[in-house]
Amino acid sequence: MYFEKITVKGEGKTDSVIEFRQGVNIVQGRSNTGKTAIIRCIDFALGSKKLPIDESFGYNEVELTIATPKGQVIINRLFHKGQVTVTTTIPDAENGVYDLKKTKNNKHPILSDLLLNTMGIDTPCEVIQNVDFKKQKLYIRTFLGMLMYIHTEIGREISIIEP
């Protein structure tokens, strides 16, 4: 599984698109050019409550395209919505509305379950949360930090990549 593309959309705005390739992708650049926004948009599409960018820019939707061995998954999430719309080519997977978290009253499938299943992880799945062996439900965002590495070295005056 890998992220193919992240798109930020807004009414009357030109889509802002970043495409990725399979393997390691490095997002680098000067300060205040949107690197952190890319990571926040991916996190938001997968369930973060925090808006990925300031609404004053005129954008209000994030679309994340994911390639999996079983097919493609396209996740659309509007700002201030606790659900996503999924379009997928994965056989036996549902297109339509997905909830972001498991609750007692879910009416829709859970996004994380779809993504974990495409990775070969049966759901529901629990993992150990702490030294007392308390368990918690496994979500895709549980290990998002292993899929995306964010490196910040704010004090560095000279870029290690650019001359």
Predicted features, each with a name:
Residues 1-75:
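Extreme N-terminal "head/tail" segments of very large remodeling/mechanoenzyme assemblies
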Residues 79-163:
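Extended, charged alpha-helical "arm/stalk" segments used for dimerization and assembly
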